[in-house]
A protein has these predicted regions:
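C-terminal substrate-binding/active-site "lid" region of AdoMet-derived donor-dependent transferases
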Residues: 188-251
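The AdoMet/dcAdoMet-binding core of the Class I SAM-like
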Residues: 55, 78-196, 200
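Alpha-helical subdomain
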Residues: 181, 208-212, 284-291
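A generic structural signal for alpha->beta connector loops
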Residues: 121-123, 147-149, 201, 226-228, ...
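SAM/dcSAM-binding transferase cores
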Residues: 9-14, 23-25, 29-56, 60, ...
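A short, flexible beta-alpha/helix-coil linker loop
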Residues: 66-70, 176-179, 204
Length: 292
């Protein structure tokens, strides 16, 4: 498939057909490989299809499997529909005014759009390995065009991070291929490069599946590099947002975190108080402090 052919969906149904109780809007072929209805249980090739579907007013992105990568509410395109994307915003409890956010993995652009809308003084750079995913995100998920605040770049996330030391104060990593986390962005070398890519007060935020047999290994790799690590379980079981701090946040008092959570909830509408309570269940703590 040529680059120009990837710019738009190669398969479109003006009269959508039902597939797994969803309406299929379009399927985009990446790398010349199109998977069928996810049959046979075979592990998909790295480059596969991008499917856009709709159900009950929610549009979703799939990468060659039934797993939902991104979702957008048509009535509110900037809302963070999936609970793991909301959990990844828990970093605001510690870094409420990010200056430059770098994201590895665009998907449907949920986090990119949220930062763009609610943080007008923040610069956002999003790295996506597939040009076709970028095209779909902009055509079907209302990801804005690049401007002085937003840049969406085509490239491999691990290589980009390695080439940009001390470039950002927040680095968000959500790179899955529909089956598992992309290996280039969960290695010990990647986490070391992520540490180097952050400013001194920076924080790495990684979306991990707690059902992944390698979850503990990934977490250990992060802990080996960063000064402090805090896990935030998503409201829907299965995902954990791992926040890793280049410089330790100390031992924040629970009362202070709850106060910050209430203020952030009022501003952004996310369940920050639940994030705080999730931290209590997942991390070293005392009755009065986190990481104590």
């Amino acid at each position: 498939v040529t680059e120009s052919a990837i710019e738009k969906p190669l398969f479109y149904r003006p009269r959508p057909a039902r597939l797994h109780s969803r309406v299929v809007i379009a399927v985009l072929i990446l790398g010349g490989i199109l998977l069928g209805k996810w049959k046979l249980g075979l592990r998909k090739p790295r480059k596969a299809s991008v499917e856009v579907s709709e159900q009950d007013g929610v549009r979703s992105l799939h990468l060659g499997s039934e797993t939902v990568q991104s979702s957008m509410k048509l009535a509110d395109p900037y809302e963070l529909v999936l609970s793991y994307t909301r959990a990844m915003m828990a970093f605001l409890l510690f870094r409420p005014q990010p200056r430059h956010v770098v994201m590895i993995g665009l998907g449907g652009g949920s986090l990119t759009k949220f930062i763009y809308r609610y943080f007008p003084d923040t610069r956002t750079t999003t790295i996506e390995s597939e040009s076709g995913v970028v095209a779909v995100a902009r055509q079907y998920f209302q990801v804005p065009a690049d401007d002085e605040r937003l840049s969406v770049e085509i490239g491999e996330g691990g290589a980009w991070v390695a080439a940009h030391p001390e470039c950002c104060d927040v680095l968000m990593v959500d790179g899955y291929d529909g089956i598992e986390q992309v290996s280039e962005i969960c290695s010990a070398d990647f986490y070391a490069n992520a540490h180097a890519a952050l400013t001194d007060d920076g924080v790495l935020v990684v979306n991990l599946w707690n059902s992944d047999l390698r979850f503990d290994a990934y977490l250990q790799r992060i802990e080996n590099v960063f000064a402090a690590v805090v896990c935030v379980p998503a409201e829907k079981r299965g995902n954990v947002a791992v926040m890793a701090f280049k410089r330790s946040p100390g031992q924040p008092r629970w009362d202070d975190l709850r106060s910050a959570a209430r203020a952030l909830h009022s501003r952004y509408g996310l369940e920050f108080l639940k994030f705080v309570e999730g931290m209590r269940s997942q991390n070293p703590r005392s009755a009065s402090r986190l990481l104590a």
